[in-house]
């Protein structure tokens, strides 16, 4: 590991807005039994009727989990705080729940040095909890808010395990407690029951805090009615890897599951987790980047069949930390399993959105799923997409059902001034050299010039606006003069004030057959490499050009080996999901 320091991404809270209208009293009913509730509605949403000053605070409760992640012979307990409205004795309230590894802050820990050689496969060629805006907004509207510290963090027991079953079960235990299936205790050891709750729980959060709802939903736990994952991970492999390549979350070069766990390891006596960290280091297999059992246990997409809660996905189309593949594959899997769902895709980066009446929409969603209020939220089109001009577009599904995969043979612009050469011409061969120290924004500039470290392919000038919705893919046939390299494809919008990298994708050529196994690459031998870029929903304006830039290493994301590897490209094509 290098001496560099890292700061892991933090979660965000949500703003609050109140809209006036008429009022009414309602009662919500669970299948098993009737629960008395007392709320009032305005515009189909709960309105604030409970005093925040009189709210009941249950601080420093400890919920007993099913796991012993620190292997001390005792079940881990997770620390939570509860804020709920002061109600009549027989009135029950549902719960909005956020679990987080970040509440007690982050430690500065070393990250991996990425300025190093790639590994060649040897084989025969073939902080204090603040209930904040959740509590301020929802408690007066008849909700309890629970904020927890995940295993190994803050006042909780155990060790952080970066997304595996132990972390999932530790988070799930709070829902079990709310429904009478787990025990919780005060600091003095007195048992506490959640007899004030209807048992209906909605989980939410941003980033890691939004990832845990995805994970817990795959357990099918009873009582979890809905989740709102914002900028959330659905598969940890795709957070730290891509098609066999070791890939960094945007802005956090050198981060991986082990130093992530070290950064959030804020419990007392953190040294007891030393063995757990070592197991993370071994399991993540940073050397090959292959998908293995370690990553499979942290893949929630494959377990979408177990999800019983509804899901409201929120993600930024320009999120290069938790990249867009995370929402796209999760959304697809949920649809395949008929999970009730809704999605907002905004133009921001890593985080949520406050535009498009977000707070009111979230309020209605929670009211529908936790109080059973018929407010029309499920009658809306499933997907809202924010366009580049900040307006919002409603569509039936995502990718847009009108998107058609279109195979395109591009035009090479930087090898011939007078005669564009078809990328698909069998008798044409083009080469470029890897230099990992040159950043991608430099490599996409001036597409008309010949640059040794890239190939630029451009389409003719667009005669009309052209929208993509889905996952671009690229396929190239060619060879490498070494047994190891990176491969990177950049989809670029040419024609504005400066080139804009719309999306990108990476591959380890040694994973030419699968992400599970590396294949030894024979220098000079032709292979066909096919890989995906990150999904997107983007409009190329009329008068612009769509470009594909091929490079080897990507400074901000890949391992950065020594310069000089030569890549030769012969036949290639790109497939774009173009909306007709």
Swiss-Prot record:
Which Cys pairs does UniProt list as disulfide-bonded? none
Q: Name one Pfam family in it.
A: PepX_C
Quote the catalytic residue positions. 207 (charge relay system), 319 (charge relay system), 350 (charge relay system)
Class of this enzyme: hydrolase
Q: GO molecular function: any one? A: serine-type peptidase activity
UniProt keywords (A-Z) are: Aminopeptidase, Hydrolase, Protease, Serine protease
What are the GO BP annotations of this UniProt entry?
proteolysis
Q: What is its EC number?
A: 3.4.14.11
Which InterPro entries does this UniProt record tie to the protein? AB_hydrolase_fold, Galactose-bd-like_sf, Pept_S15_Xpro, Xaa-Pro-like_dom, Xaa-Pro_dipept_C
Which top-rank group of organisms is this from?
Bacteria
As its record notes, the protein acts as a catalyst of:
Hydrolyzes Xaa-Pro-|- bonds to release unblocked, N-terminal dipeptides from substrates including Ala-Pro-|-p-nitroanilide and (sequentially) Tyr-Pro-|-Phe-Pro-|-Gly-Pro-|-Ile
Residues in coiled coil = none
What SUPFAM superfamilies is this protein classified in? alpha/beta-Hydrolases (SSF53474), Galactose-binding domain-like (SSF49785)
What does the sequence similarity comment in the record state about its family?
Belongs to the peptidase S15 family.
What is the protein name for this chain? Putative Xaa-Pro dipeptidyl-peptidase
């Amino acid at each position: 590991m290098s001496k560099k320091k890292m700061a892991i991404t933090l979660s965000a809270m949500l703003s609050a807005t109140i809209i006036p209208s008429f009022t009414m009293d309602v009662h919500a009913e669970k299948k098993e039994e009737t629960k008395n509730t007392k709320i009032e509605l305005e515009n189909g949403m709960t309105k604030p009727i409970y005093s925040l000053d009189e709210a009941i605070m249950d601080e420093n409760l400890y919920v007993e989990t099913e796991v012993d992640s620190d292997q001390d012979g005792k079940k881990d307990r997770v620390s939570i705080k509860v804020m709920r409205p002061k109600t009549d004795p027989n009135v029950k309230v549902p719960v909005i729940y956020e679990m987080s590894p970040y509440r007690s802050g982050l430690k500065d820990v070393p990250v991996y040095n990425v300025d190093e050689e790639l590994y060649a496969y040897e084989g025969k060629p073939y902080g204090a909890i603040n209930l904040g805006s959740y509590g301020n907004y929802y408690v007066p509207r008849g909700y309890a808010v629970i904020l927890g510290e995940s295993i190994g963090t803050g006042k909780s027991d155990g060790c952080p395990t970066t997304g595996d079953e132990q972390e999932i079960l530790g988070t799930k235990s709070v829902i079990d407690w709310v429904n009478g299936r787990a025990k919780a205790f005060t600091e003095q050891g007195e048992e506490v029951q959640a007899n004030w709750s209807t048992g209906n729980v909605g989980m939410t959060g941003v980033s890691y805090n939004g990832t845990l709802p995805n994970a817990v939903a795959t357990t099918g736990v009873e009582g979890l009615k809905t989740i709102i994952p914002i900028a959330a991970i659905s598969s940890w492999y795709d957070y730290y890897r891509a098609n066999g390549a070791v890939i960094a979350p945007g802005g956090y070069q050198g981060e991986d599951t082990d130093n992530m766990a070290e950064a959030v390891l804020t419990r007392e006596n953190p040294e007891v987790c030393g063995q757990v960290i070592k197991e993370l280091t071994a399991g993540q297999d940073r050397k090959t980047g292959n998908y293995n059992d370690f990553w499979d246990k942290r893949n929630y997409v494959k377990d979408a069949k177990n999800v019983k809660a509804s899901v409201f996905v929120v993600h930024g189309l320009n999120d290069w930390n938790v990249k867009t593949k995370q929402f796209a594959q999760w959304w697809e899997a949920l649809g395949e399993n008929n999970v009730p769902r809704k999605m907002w895709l905004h133009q921001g980066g890593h985080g949520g959105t406050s535009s498009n009446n977000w707070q009111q929409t979230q309020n209605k969603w929670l009211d529908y799923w936790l109080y059973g209020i018929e407010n029309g939220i499920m009658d809306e089109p499933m997907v809202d997409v924010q366009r580049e001009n900040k307006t919002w577009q409603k569509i039936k599904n995502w990718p847009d059902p009108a998107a058609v995969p279109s195979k395109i043979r591009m035009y090479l612009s930087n090898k011939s001034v007078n005669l564009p050469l078809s990328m698909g011409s069998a008798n044409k061969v083009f080469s470029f050299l890897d230099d990992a120290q040159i950043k991608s924004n430099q490599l996409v500039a001036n597409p008309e010039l010949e640059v040794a470290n890239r190939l630029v392919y451009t389409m003719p000038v667009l005669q009309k606006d052209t929208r993509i919705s889905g996952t671009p893919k690229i396929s190239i046939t060619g060879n490498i003069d070494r047994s190891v390299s990176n491969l990177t494809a950049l989809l670029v919008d040419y024609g504005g004030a400066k080139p804009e990298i719309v999306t990108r994708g990476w591959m380890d050529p040694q994973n030419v057959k699968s992400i599970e196994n590396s294949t030894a690459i024979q220098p000079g031998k032709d292979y066909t490499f096919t890989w995906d870029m990150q999904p997107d929903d983007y409009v190329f304006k009329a008068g612009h050009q769509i470009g594909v830039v091929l490079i080897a290493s990507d400074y901000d994301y890949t391992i950065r080996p020594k310069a000089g590897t030569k890549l030769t490209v012969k036949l290639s094509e790109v497939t774009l999901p173009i909306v007709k």
